[in-house]
From Swiss-Prot:
It is found in: Periplasm. It comes from Salmonella arizonae (strain ATCC BAA-731 / CDC346-86 / RSK2980). The lineage of its organism: Bacteria, Pseudomonadati, Pseudomonadota, Gammaproteobacteria, Enterobacterales. Residues 107-208 form a coiled coil. Keywords: Coiled coil, Periplasm, Signal. PANTHER family: EFFLUX SYSTEM COMPONENT YKNX-RELATED, UPF0194 MEMBRANE PROTEIN YBHG. Residues 1-19 form the signal peptide. Pfam families: HlyD_D23. It comes from the Bacteria. The keyword Signal applies. This is UPF0194 membrane protein YbhG.
Amino acid sequence: MKKPVVIGLAIAAIVTVIAGGTWWYQSRQDDGLTLYGNVDIRTVNISFRVGGRLASLNVDEGDTIKAGQVLGELDHAPYENALMQAKAGVSVAQAQYDLMLAGYRDEEIAQAAAAVRQAQAAYDYAQNFYNRQQGLWKSRTISANDLENARSSRDQAQATLKSAQDKLSQYRTGNREQDIAQAKASLEQAKAQLAQAQLDLQDTTLIAPSNGTLLTRAVEPGSMLNAGSTVLTLSLTRPVWVRAYVDERNLSQTQPGREILLYTDGRPDKPYHGKIGFVSPTAEFTPKTVETPDLRTDLVYRLRIIVTDADDALRQGMPVTVKFNDEARHE
């Protein structure tokens, strides 16, 4: 009798375990997938593109910032001076280019022609004097030194005539294409320097790139700053994203566009609504910040969830429970 009783008890225990497991599995299926994540921390380090002395800051930590808002300014004076110099450089280059295009005036050509005539007369005189000196040298009336001096004077007069003739030829034919191109390039370079000076002056004003809340004010007016030095740190408040991770077994449930519910400790009975906006195409080891114990040794995929009804109570870094049950489709 004892043996049938033992067998019966064993069968009853097995049935109980199976029933309990079935109930647990069904309850897990009814509850849906649950993940744990955090509100994404999204910040921007705001800096001047140019360096200089910080003249003013118009905001403080905790202030609400609007895109396009003036946050602070550098000392403008050095950049205003540079802009004036750049404008003067453009004026000089423009004048030089215009001269190259216009060529030489009639008065300049006439002066060059007169210089040629004068140089020609000087050369003719030097040549005739040299010829006479040669005759005297043959009769040994003058010394070799006197003849050499006459030759040098003739050669110098010839060089002066050649230079005057070349100058007159240039005046009559106008400037070379290469010279005009060089003047044009100098003008374009001066204009580029002017544009850069205007941009540098514009960049002495610090403009908010987007809406947000000011987290930190790293420096104070009077500080000397290098280009790119962080002045302010802005927390981007919209849109609000939640970062969560899912293992490969449940990856099929996390399709982009799927609606889900997001719970926080501060309002457990009033969930936020969200949609999956991005699923990472590559797996990674579970980050240390993930709170789910059974995922800590798994390869997981990162999710970005866009909160569609976020408010100021949903702060960056806040832990969030992500529910994938069917309620999210009807809430």
